[in-house]
Amino acid sequence: MLLPVFTLKLRHKISPRMVAIGRYDGTHPCLAAATQAGKVFIHNPHTRSQHFSASRVFQSPLESDVSLLNINQTVSCLGSGVLNPELGYDTLLVGTQTSLLAYDIYNNSDLFYREVSDGANAIVLGTLGDIAPPLAIIGGNCALQGFDHEGNDLFWTVTGDNVHSLALCDFDGDGKTELLVGSEDFDIRVFKEDEIVAEMTETEIVTSLCPMYGSRFGYALSNGTVGVYDKTARYWRIKSKNHAMSIHAFDINSDGVCELITGWSNGKVDARSDRTGEVIFKDNFSSAVAGVVEGDYRMDGHVQLICCSVDGEIRGYLPGTAEMKGNLLDTSVEQDLIRELSQKKQNLLLELRNYEESTKAELSSPLNEADGQKGIIPANTRLHTALSVNMGNDLQDAHAELGISTSNDTIIRAVLIFAEGIFVGESHVVHPSIHNLSSSLRVPITPPKDVPVDLHLKTFVGYRSSTQFHVFELTRQLPRFTMYALTSPDAASEPVSYVNFSVAERTQRMVTWLNQNFLLPEDSNVQNSPFHVCFTSLRNGGQLYIKMKQSGEITVNTDDIDLAGDIIQSIASFFAIEDLQVEADFPVYFEELRKVLVKVDEYHSVHQKLSADMADNSNLIRSLLVRAEDARLMRDMKTMKSRYMELYDLNKDLLNGYKIRCNNHTELLGNLKAVNQAIQRAGRLRVGKPKNQVISACRDAIRSNNINTLFRIMRVGTAPS
């Protein structure tokens, strides 16, 4: 069993996911963590006599080895690492919803302070791709920014939604690190500098990411799921009723391979094998785990796994020795093995008994329905599945439909469907009443997003009187654009919005792509020439037209810019296109974006006016306070009372102004998110280098406040020369 080598109990609360460790003087490892009231504490047990007198840092009145850093804002993320290689020691990075502070603890000074309009929800420090200096990369309101040690903005790009987690990892094995981004839209995106090279869709918000080794990384979701990916392939995942607060890679059993360490909301800490997800170590805190880090905290040459709880308890664990042979739990390996083998034995005996009973029944009498209760069904029984589109009626919305049927008179007693991102809890059970049993049933399916999904089916087949059933297991893939029904081009008007591009492919290959990605009726016959198909969205009734000329020119008409982006990305992936330039026009969406940009300007103006008013009021308060105190010292109580009444009124004005500032800031963030998403959508309409050029040019246009240029870039993909 693995026991902690040290335990500390600090009298400071620790905010969840806000723990970092660093050598802030180049020698001694110190813990930094966000605590209450907009402060960060630094625990330094190595130099207890050191006292700070800077304006930001002051000694904690509760503990001599804890110093407090005043941020005066709610801390939203915390990180540490070497930002300036010339200094030779770590820098503390503190992110809030409006700013990023790089603090030099050793010299008690700001390395830099930057206002970030998109906020900082997550932070990671390191080198990215070919960008030479180390960067402090923050993820905020649909945007990613990277700053060097001078605060220069060397990296910027947009992503699909609010960022919740970041990690650096050599994803493609080229010796250079890529940026992993987890966001609110359930996606894990991999950025090679500003280019997205891979996307993995999960089932909930991605709250944590951590590199393990090579291209392998761990992840955690807001629904209690943790798991491990190797590139785009998921190795394993488990789901708990508790929430994963922090994950970290650490070799806890000294086998040369990092395990995934998870700190949970119920106080449990466990280590799982990177290959199987098997628990090889666990411990419990009395409160939720706030963070998991590693460092040589005792300065004895051995790195410890350091776990912190929200109540301020800190425990350090040394990796297990070779003599422990990986046995880090209370129970012995032999006991676990015996228990596992006993369980397998019981399962096999039960299965053997069922086979013996079925064999006896077959020998004693011919097959009839009465024997069905013993679980006997004809040997040639087959299970058929079919996917189709149901346009719905007055009682039911339009949806995709999974049809399941047997090949004879056997009935389907129940169906279990496992699918990510479609059903609540990722599973769905269809269990008809005894009066409605038949050899076929239909299951409505409504995918919320346009992504391909594997449906794993377990179907219980038998007779009405059966007490035992045969279980048929099969997997069926739901095409990416399942929620679009093929309709006649003459049935509705063609959308005004469009994208236009050219590919060096035959129309026959386009038909193949169509069959793979849409649910087409069996009797449909899509012509190669002219290639012209029309679909209706089952979600909102919107129209989608896809046309292709013999020359390879493709036009997609739809008013949904997200759908157009998905279509282009799917076609580019199918035809293995690396670079694709696209001409696009979405008049309605662009007009909405123009209104948003006008609002952003208005909110910025209001923000500046409110800031100026607040500065004026602050000066007036200072003056009134001095006059009031002068009157008190001169025993002029009437004047003193008058001055304090004025101060009271001014204070009320300041509070009202603060509320207006808060509301203004919230509205501004919402509109900035819409702008960043618009740039992301414009980028998704292109592939490869044209995509990166569009995102970069759009940002330059917004910086220079050139709205007309911005819309031209979004339409044609390049800035005017």
Swiss-Prot record:
GO cellular component: BBSome; centriolar satellite; ciliary basal body; ciliary membrane; cytoplasm; membrane; microvillus; motile cilium
Protein function: The BBSome complex is thought to function as a coat complex required for sorting of specific membrane proteins to the primary cilia. The BBSome complex is required for ciliogenesis but is dispensable for centriolar satellite function. This ciliogenic function is mediated in part by the Rab8 GDP/GTP exchange factor, which localizes to the basal body and contacts the BBSome. Rab8(GTP) enters the primary cilium and promotes extension of the ciliary membrane.
Protein name: BBSome complex member BBS2
Alphabetical GO biological process terms: adult behavior; artery smooth muscle contraction; brain morphogenesis; cartilage development; cerebral cortex development; cilium assembly; fat cell differentiation; gene expression
Subunit structure: Part of BBSome complex, that contains BBS1, BBS2, BBS4, BBS5, BBS7, BBS8/TTC8, BBS9 and BBIP10. Interacts (via C-terminus) with BBS7. Interacts (via coiled coil domain) with MKKS. Interacts with CCDC28B. Interacts with DLEC1.
Top-rank lineage group of the source organism: Eukaryota
Gene: Bbs2
Subcellular location: Cell projection, Cilium membrane; Cytoplasm; Cytoplasm, Cytoskeleton, Microtubule organizing center, Centrosome, Centriolar satellite
Presence of keyword Transport: yes
InterPro entries attached to this UniProt entry: Bardet-Biedl_syndrome_2_prot (IPR016616), BBS2_CtH_dom (IPR055381), BBS2_GAE_dom (IPR029333), BBS2_hp_dom (IPR055380), BBS2_Mid (IPR029429), BBS2_N (IPR029430), BBS2_pf_dom (IPR055379), WD40_repeat_dom_sf (IPR036322)
Molecular function per GO: RNA polymerase II-specific DNA-binding transcription factor binding
Coiled coil regions, renumbered to chain: 325-369
Disruption phenotype: In mice obesity is associated with hyperleptinemia and resistance to the anorectic and weight-reducing effects of leptinan mice are resistant to the metabolic actions of leptin.
Keywords: Cell membrane, Cell projection, Cilium, Cilium biogenesis/degradation, Coiled coil, Cytoplasm, Cytoskeleton, Membrane, Protein transport, Transport
SUPFAM superfamilies: WD40 repeat-like
